[in-house]
Every structure is written in C-alpha cells, then in structure tokens.
Amino acid sequence: MAALIKTFLLLFCCMAIVYLINYLRTLWNKSVIFVCDDPNLYPYKKYRTDAGWDIKAAEDIEIEPGKYAAIATGLRVVIPEGYYGHILPRSGLAVKNGIMTMAGVIDSEYRNEVKVLLYNAGDKTFEVKRGDRIAQLVVTKILLSSELLPSEEAIELGYMETERGTSGFGSTGVK
C-alpha cells in the first residue's frame, strides 16, 4: 500500500511540474520584450496599471508648423502572436503644443526600430529632445481569423440584429 501511495505522489508531482512549465510558457509567450541599447530610452509605465508604455525620442529634432517628422526611438519590440502594438498620443503634447501623434501599428512579426510619426499642428516650431516622452505604446489582443459571410446569410443567421440596430454617430446622446 505504501508503494502505491509513493507512486501516486510521484505521478502527481510530475503532473504538477508539467502543468507549471506549461503555465510559465504561456506567461512568457504573452510578455512584451523591449530591446534597446540605451537604458535611458527604455519605455516605462509610471503606474503598474497604465495601459501604455511611454516611448522616448532617441534624437533631437525640430518640427516646423504644418510638417511631419518620423522620430527615431532606438527601440525594437517583440510582441507576442495574437497581439499588436498601437502607437498613441500623449495628451499633453496635443493640448500644450498642438503636436499630433499619427497612427502607428506594430505587428507581432515586426523587428526593426520603432519610429513615431509626429505632426506639428501648432503655429511654432516644436523641438523634440533626446529622452522626451513623445508617444505611448499600447499592446492589444487581436483576432487571428475571420469568417466572411454574404450579407443575406448574415441577416438570416441573425448576426445583424442588435438592440442598438443601425443607430450611429450621436445616437446615445450627450447626457
């Protein structure tokens, strides 16, 4: 009987180890890895619960009013499959300086340097200094597959019926 219990415990421990390894592998596969030669340019979150990492400029550059500039960051990023990185604005740049961050999508297989496209909508030349926080990177889950349906079939299956219906812009009111 004691031998049977020892065998059972050994089997249970082995199964627990396999489960733990698979669990850790799952966590690893969902981590975002930043690659940067200059520690001063590492992205960071001020608070653990922030949605995005602040991205810093790797160069000094001036952006004239009405002009665009692609700003080097010195940063490469490894994003897990099933996710993408979205370059988004930092609200202070727009409000205080009229600087707009243009759309930026980083697919999970992209490995080159991340650049941030800024547009100066203000009336003064805007100076970007190395180390300035110029954008934020938010990593978001995506769907990896889709199904195409003819309109008639989608309607027949009830996919197009919702409580909201076809109501769009402004349909929920202001208050």
Walk through the language-model features, giving the residues of each.
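DUTPase catalytic domain/fold
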Residues: 2-175
